[in-house]
Curated annotation (Swiss-Prot):
Gene Ontology molecular functions: zinc ion binding
Lipid metabolism among keywords: no
Signal peptide location: 1-28
Species of origin: Streptococcus pyogenes serotype M3 (strain ATCC BAA-595 / MGAS315)
Pfam families in UniProt: ZinT, ZnuA
CDD domains, sorted: AdcA
Region annotated Disordered, chain positions: 126-148
Name assigned to this protein: Zinc-binding protein AdcA
Length: 515
């Protein structure tokens, strides 16, 4: 009897093993059903999946991705798919809600940007300008159509490589039986992107004119990666004639800098183009944001690469012609955050402005979490400093062994945590000090003094968070010492920095990068 049971169990095991093998074989031979959001995601995913899947796209040409809201039918398509691929939550802002509504657990959700850090979107940037190296805030800055962060990474061939790698890795992990094909397809596609990247680098690295003027501020990453300056203008759209007042101011701006072209995301109507040419003396040209291609265009052979090369050709109408440096219409750099304010605007603050639990950013610098930040800063500096030099600079600035600080504004206490050991002291407000830095911008230190005689190195503390009047801090730089407030005023090289303890390292990196 025991032998029969063992034989039966053995047969059952063999049967299930065979069934599993068959299931894997069916999956390997079958096609993965993938739903994507808009054209670049569709194009990249199709290039990776190849013949191993059916790739579809929710948004058709003519749909504005920034304003798109999925229908019930669209959500069902996602629900019925094997995988759903999108670019970023700052582009497809509806994705988080769709994720919550999905009842099927089988759908693999892939975010194209993965763990990429983004820059601030237009309208959300504090316009923090890299300033003098001796200023404690000058080179460390924090957290923009209106996105909190700019999602248009696909318009830079250099960054598109990372997007393709992210999609490849996620799909390969979800479908290991097809991973070999996905990786081979992705390798071929990435080689094409590398060639495109080389073309952009060759054409733009020695551009005679580094600035271009655009109506749609979607080309920030492209400008950043190839050494250009994107300058966006307001009040000019391709299908509506500008007001007489706007034409007048635009005409002055165009003449001042010798601007020959303003770039639109689509062909400007003949009336708009004629008005710009006649009244402002500037031509309209198209830089495609590549948010959609029609079936007709795709059948005619147009794709990501043809459109991006056309963009490069059009961009060279500006970059190949020498001229004076083009600056934005308005200087938005002289903000309070950047240290430009009047003395009368500075107000006293209470410890409650910094209430909460705070963590040092220094460990994230040490473990590499902030490395993308240094890469971005190096590109923004346009050769003034390398990523390694930025990291060294911030290593000096951020360095501290006080890993956590807890502040109770009501009790007026600060608790310093070092290697798990806590020290708590009670503080009184000791006034404010306005400091002027070598470049001409300024900062405010808000000073506090411990009541306890045994406070030692924590006797005197000073907060700096780019604000000059009462408001709740999102982060801060803290200076402390046991000698005097005056001695702390001279400290410009070392500024331990703290963010909320509820933030992850990546969230902090994103905040720093966008400021």
């Amino acid at each position: 009897m025991k032998k029969k049971i063992l034989l039966m169990m053995s047969l059952i095991s063999v049967f299930f093993a065979w069934q599993l093998t068959q299931a894997k074989q069916v999956l390997a031979e079958g096609k993965v059903k993938v739903v994507t959001t808009f054209y670049p995601v569709y194009e990249f995913t199709k290039g990776i999946v190849g013949n191993d899947g059916d790739v579809s796209m929710l948004m058709k040409a003519g749909t504005e991705p920034h304003d798109f809201e999925p229908s019930t039918k669209d959500i069902k398509k996602i629900q019925d798919a094997d995988a759903f691929v999108y670019m970023d939550d700052n582009m497809e802002t509806w994705v988080s809600d769709v994720k919550k509504s999905l009842t099927s657990k089988k759908v693999t959700i892939v975010k194209g940007t993965g763990n990429m850090l983004l820059v601030a979107g237009v309208g959300h940037d504090h316009h923090h300008e890299e300033a003098d190296k001796k200023h404690e805030h000058n080179k460390h800055s924090e957290e923009g159509h209106n996105h909190a962060f700019d999602p248009h990474v696909w318009l830079s061939p250099y960054r598109s490589i990372t997007v393709v790698e992210n999609i490849r890795d996620s799909l390969s992990k979800a479908y290991p039986e097809k991973a070999e094909n996905f990786k081979a397809n992705a390798a071929t596609y990435i080689e094409k992107l590398k060639e495109l990247d080389k073309d952009y680098t060759a054409a733009l690295s020695d551009a005679k004119q580094k600035s271009f003027v655009t109506q749609h501020a979607a080309f920030g990453y492209m400008a950043l990666d190839y050494g250009l300056n994107q300058i966006s203008i307001n009040g000019v759209i391709p299908d509506a004639e500008p007001s007489a007042k706007r034409i007048a101011t635009l005409s002055k701006y165009v003449k001042k800098y010798g601007i020959k072209y303003i770039y639109f995301e689509e062909n400007a109507s003949s009336k708009v183009a004629k008005t710009l040419a006649k009244e402002a003396g500037v031509k309209a040209a198209v830089l495609s944001p590549l948010e959609g291609l029609t079936e007709k265009e795709m059948k005619a052979g147009q794709d990501y690469f043809t459109v991006m090369r056309k963009n490069l050709e059009t961009l060279r109408l500006t970059t190949d012609v020498a001229g004076k440096e083009i600056l934005p219409e308005k200087d938005t750099t002289k903000t309070v955050y950047n240290g430009y304010f009047k003395d009368k605007e500075v107000k006293d603050r209470q410890l409650s402005d910094w209430s909460g639990s705070w963590q040092s950013v220094y460990p994230y610098l040490q473990d590499g979490t902030l490395d993308q930040v240094w890469d971005y800063k190096a590109k923004k500096s346009k050769g003034k400093m390398t990523a390694a030099e930025y990291k060294d600079y911030y290593t000096t600035g951020y360095k501290t062994d006080v890993e956590q600080i807890k502040i109770n504004g009501k009790k007026k206490t600060m608790t310093f945590v070092r290697n798990g050991e806590k020290k708590t002291f009670t503080y009184t407000y000791a006034g404010k000090e306005i400091l002027t830095y070598p470049k001409g911008n300024r900062g405010v230190r808000f000073m506090f003094e411990a009541k306890e005689p045994n406070a030692g190195e924590f006797k005197y503390v000073q907060f700096s968070d780019h604000a000059i009047a009462p408001e709740k801090a999102e982060h801060f730089h803290l200076y402390w010492g046991g000698d005097s407030q005056e001695k702390l005023h001279k400290e410009l090289e070392h500024w331990p920095t703290y963010y909320g303890s509820d933030l992850s390292g990546r969230e902090i990196a994103q905040e720093i990068n966008a400021h």
